[in-house]
Each structure stands twice: as structure tokens, then as C-alpha cells.
Amino acid sequence: MSASFPLEALQAGHWFKLICGASYQHLPVIRNLALTYALAGADCVDVAAEPAVVRSALAGLAAYERLTGRDRPWLMVSLNDGEDLHFRRAWFDPDRCPTDCPRPCERVCPTDAITSTGVQRDRCYGCGRCLPICPLGLIEAQAWQVDAAALLPELLDLGINAIEIHTQVGHQKEFQQLWQQLQPWLPQLQAIAISCPAHPEAIAYLWDLQELVGNTVETVIWQTDGRPMSGDIGAGTTHAAVRFAQAMLTEGPPGHVQLAGGTNAHTVAKLQELKLLAPQVSRFVAGIACGGAARTPLAELLEPLAEQQRSLEAHPEVLQAAVTTAIALVGPLKQAVGGATRSIPAFLLRTP
């Protein structure tokens, strides 16, 4: 496998990106997620723009290289040009919680980030499901913004390959300011992803950004963030991203169109049904990115190892189960477009 395989996957229409979460910083899980999805055939791993997170993801990808002798997927970090749902964490004062509270917040949290002592910040990725469910309204969201100019030099030295900019309609000024900050480092990047949530004016807004970006970046990925952070809720969450991508393919600016925000195991079938995949149409969806739908099915396998600070590859049976689960999500896109479907690596099938 060549070092350019992620770009080839984009161009061919079978790109798969694992989203670890722009605010998610549970380091042992991130390491093992990166290893698992690399083995399953992912082309890119997207993580928070924090050095410790990047190091953890790279440790998982280094384990992949050792185990397979193959080049690793790209590593991408997420930035924001202003307030954004992906860049927030829940917070509450546990001393204000009544002792007899049924604690519905704990039940709805997909990462078990909420305990009797409050929110574990490294586990919270800002999905917001706890915010409306607190009986006393004690939970609030704390937003934050990545200091791109301060962090990017170190992250590039560590070995990131790409960045993703989260933006939204009405952020032209904020995007332009961030874009100017990024100029010195753009030549070092393999790709730039621009993520925007669905909105009636989204395509016109992205055309405005295209004029600003121009030809300064060779590989641009437009991420159609249909229903942010919802892919693990149910099958129907994929529809918004599919509709947005369909509109982008016919009306949007040039570049690779990649779905996110509600993507799940049903996304590929819907894209096939609408003939949006290669080679069914001349301009096709370049790929999909999955967050909750990719992480949640692996939680029961990876969390116990994280608590014990154990590497996944030291437990072959768990690794095989994790990779099998991941292939079930990655494989359909690769198969549908004729990409190289990853089978269970031979070393995982060896019996002791």
C-alpha cells in the first residue's frame, strides 16, 4: 500500500474517516480506536487539536505500522472558526445535585462521562444530550476555541497530515481570520477539510469560502455535516447528511464531498439507492466520516483496556473482535465502490 492511498481513496470515492471527536480526549481509547480502524481500512483518523491527543493517535497508528508493515492513514486535527457544537463540553457543579436525583444525564451520556463527581472532561465530546434532560437544569455547555496559530507548528512536527475547519453560515469573517492565520502552514498539509452543518444558505456560503480558498490548497474536502454528533442514535439520522451531499454534488463548489453528521451503517445503502457513489455518476460522493457510529459499538471492548492502561494489540482476541466490528462499518463503502476491502489481518487469525 502506497503512502498516497488516502488521496487515492478520495479520488476513487471510497474514503473512510474515523472521527474521534474535536473535544474528545480519552487518550487510551483514542490510541486503540486509531489502531482498530486503521486495521479495518480507514483512510484518515480525525482527532482533537491537542498534542497529547495527537501523540495517542499516532501511537495507535505506529502500532498498526508495526503489525502490518503498511503506511498509516492520514491523521487530521479539527479546528473551529468560532462557536461550534463540536467544541464544547458539558459542566455542572455536583454539589448542587440532589441525592435523590434519578440522574437521567448518566443514562443518556454515550461515553459514560458523567459520574457523581461531575463531568469527566476527557470523555465528553459535546453531544449535548445531557443538557435538556437534567430535571433542575444544572448542566451547561462550556464552549472553547482552538488556538490554531499556537498549536499547529507543534502538531505538524508531531506528524499530522491534514486539518479540518468547522464553520457555519454567517462565519465569513471568522473563517477569513482563521484562514489568514493558517497561511504559513498550508503547504505542509496533504488536505484541508471544511465542515459545515446543513442550512438553507449553506451552499451559497461554501461558494463564498471557495472564493477565499481559491487554488491555494490542492485537495479540499467539503464535509456535509447533516445532523452533528448523532450517528449512534438511529438509522434515520443519516438522511440530513445525504440530502446535503446530494445538493453539494449538483450545486456546490468543486472539491471532494464527504458526508458526516448522522452517518452510520445505513449511509452507504442510501447513497447507493440514490446513485451518489462511484461509478454510478460523474460527480460522486468521495467518502464518509463516522464518529458516534464508529466509537459506540467498540466501547465495551475498549473501555476496560483503557481503565487498565493496556494496549489493544496485547489482547489478540479483543483486537480481533474490535477489528471485525470496525470492518462491518468500513467495508460496505469499500465494497460498493470497488475499493480494497480489508479482511481480518492474518496475524489476528493465528491460533495460539
From Swiss-Prot:
One of its GO terms (molecular function) is 4 iron, 4 sulfur cluster binding. Keywords: 4Fe-4S, Biological rhythms, Iron, Iron-sulfur, Metal-binding. GO terms for biological process: circadian rhythm; detection of redox state. It comes from the Bacteria. Binds 2 [4Fe-4S] clusters. The keyword Iron-sulfur applies. Disruption phenotype: Grows slightly more slowly than wild-type, decreased phycocyanin content, does not modify photoperiods in response to increasing light intensity, shortens the photoperiod by 1 hour. 20% reduction in the level of CikA, CikA is slightly less sensitive to DBMIB, CikA levels do not decrease in high light as they do in wild-type. KaiA levels are higher than usual under all light regimes. [4Fe-4S] cluster 1 binds at C97, C101, C105, C109. SUPFAM superfamilies: 4Fe-4S ferredoxins. Residues 88-119, 121-144 form the 4Fe-4S ferredoxin-type domain. InterPro entries: 4Fe4S_Fe-S-bd, 4Fe4S_Fe_S_CS, Fe-S-bd_prot_LdpA_C, PSI_iron-sulfur_center. It holds the Pfam family LdpA_C. [4Fe-4S] cluster 2 binds at C124, C127, C130, C134. Its cofactor is [4Fe-4S] cluster. The keyword Disulfide bond does not apply. PROSITE patterns: 4FE4S_FER_1 (PS00198), 4FE4S_FER_2 (PS51379). Functions in an input pathway to the Kai circadian clock. Probably senses the metabolic state of the cell via plastoquinone levels and informs the clock to modulate the photoperiod length. Deletion decreases the ability of the bacteria to modulate the circadian period in response to altered light regimes. Mild overexpression increases the photoperiod. Rapidly degraded in the presence of the quinone analog DBMIB (2,5-dibromo-3-methyl-6-isopropyl-p-benzoquinone), an artifical electron acceptor for photosystem II that reduces the plastoquinone pool. Interacts with KaiA, CikA and SasA; the complexes do not follow circadian rhythms. This is Light dependent period A. It comes from Synechococcus elongatus (strain ATCC 33912 / PCC 7942 / FACHB-805).
